[in-house]
Regions:
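Short N-terminal strand-loop motif that marks the start
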Residues: 1-78, 147-149
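Short loop segments at secondary-structure junctions
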Residues: 26, 82-88, 153-155
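Glycine-rich beta-strand-centered segment in the early N-terminal region that forms part
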Residues: 35-51, 64-114, 160-163
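Short, glycine/acidic-enriched loop or turn micro-motifs at the edges of active sites
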Residues: 60, 86, 175
Length: 178
């Protein structure tokens, strides 16, 4: 199919629904079940393997300073590619990707999918959002506090298969320090 394999790299079937820990009100998560979204030609479906908890997650949980509720939090996550669109061949650094690879993601450029994270050093780029801090929409799998996340075309993501789970979870917090 144009949208890639219907089973995970581990050989198991991809479920028809996904579960999301949705922040539905201040200090209140609900486990919501949503239909598994379609994977477009430029998208990647990732089975979440782990996610750190950031101070930003705690602020959103306590006060919703960004006015995002309802929201699927979690932006320090990592997981395994279980389905990918036919146009996905390389990550944001140009490294090849395939089913079973471990990835992290940071930004989605909804206004201009041709922008890459490397353009951030060259120009003031607007329209960038962060997974785990996206307003809820019809996809719902927008944060790493879920069992699956849909990385949409136009997102930055990196193949980090050479790292163990703990190291992969620490990539985003360490990147903030650089």
């Amino acid at each position: 199919s144009a949208a890639g394999s219907a089973s995970s790299a581990a050989g198991g079937p991809i479920p028809k629904t996904a579960h999301v820990a949705m922040l539905t009100s201040l200090e209140h998560f609900e486990i919501k079940e949503f239909p598994m979204p379609e994977v477009g030609d430029d998208d990647i479906l990732v089975k979440v393997e782990g996610c750190g908890i950031c101070g930003t997650d705690a602020h959103e949980f306590k006060r919703d300073p960004f006015g995002l509720i309802p929201v699927a939090l979690g932006h320090e996550g990592t997981g395994e590619i279980v389905k990918m669109g036919k146009n996905v061949k390389v990550d944001s650094a140009g490294n090849s990707v395939k089913l079973g690879d471990k990835v992290v993601t940071c930004m989605i450029f909804k206004d201009n999918p041709d922008i890459t994270m490397f353009d951030l050093n060259k120009q003031n780029v607007g329209g960038a959002d962060v997974y785990g801090l996206l307003p809820d929409d019809d996809v719902h799998l927008n944060g790493w506090f879920a069992d699956y996340i849909l990385i949409r075309g136009g997102s930055t993501f990196f193949n980090v298969s050479d790292l163990d789970l703990d190291s992969r979870i620490l990539i985003e917090p360490c990147a903030v320090l650089v």
